[in-house]
Amino acid sequence: MKTQIPVFTEVKEKEICADESGAYNFLLEGDNLHSLYLLEKTHKGAVDVIYIDLPYNRGKTDFIYDDDFVVTEDGFRQSKWLSFMKSRLILARQLLSDKGLIFISIDDYEIATLKMLCDEIFDPSNFINIFVW
């Protein structure tokens, strides 16, 4: 990836269209950080809803994706997770429209830490609620 610049490539077979109105939606596959940087160039301030299912930072490997982001015994585990999340949430904030919403899935293990990070990035006055499901 050091020598390659990520680019959007449209795949017509994967086009998402609800009806014939011409409304266009798309699915972006790729590394989330690189994808967010690309979206910032094309969709800054234009996204109404973002849903993120984060790594829960539990060190588990029984999820569909690898949640063992940082070695469990690492003394800087939470700090590394916060740095990982902060860069992505800052980019997500840049994508949101003025009335945009972000929904974030997390478990009880990191919810307090995530809430403080979101307050820093999105401003506490923008917080609406926690949905437990």
Model segments located where?
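DnaQ-like (DEDDh/DEDDy) 3′-5′ exonuclease domain used for proofreading
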Residues: M1-Y51, G59-Q78, S87
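Short, glycine/acidic-enriched loop or turn micro-motifs at the edges of active sites
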Residues: H34, Y56, E110
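Generic beta-strand/beta-sheet core signal
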Residues: I50-N57, F103-D107
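Conserved Class I SAM-dependent methyltransferase catalytic core
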Residues: Q78-F131
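Residues embedded in well-ordered beta-strands within globular domains across many folds
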Residues: Y51, F131-V132
